[in-house]
Amino acid sequence: MRVILCLGETLEERQAGRTLDVVGAQLDGSLPASFPPGIKAKDALIVAYEPIWAIGTGLTPTNAEIAEVHGFLRARLIARFGEAGQDMRLLYGGSVKPSNAAEIFALTHVDGALVGGASLKAADFSRIVLALDAAPSRA
């Protein structure tokens, strides 16, 4: 079984400058101290940053904000799991659409996306998948 752990802040928490504190506490409170022998962290857990205020609203954090949170999460995973934390997948969710997917996938530490509403239209979803395939880290 592979778990997708979704982390995110409310609009009020973001406006108060608490995003990293909130997602850091969510991550720390949800992670095991270690994984059982024979189970690789990257195979057991995927972490997704999905700001609550962006879900279904059409609003998206800036690319700089997404990169900041993903860099923070990557550092936290490495601190917790060592090299295994580098290999764990980090996804972004929160109003991913064909018009912004390529820019989001080009960000460091963004390994994919949780796609909501855009997945309901085959053409839109296909464009998002193609954007992921073309992302620099996957070329």
Located regions from the model:
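Active-site loop-to-helix "anion-binding N-cap" substructures in soluble metabolic enzymes
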Residues: M1-A139
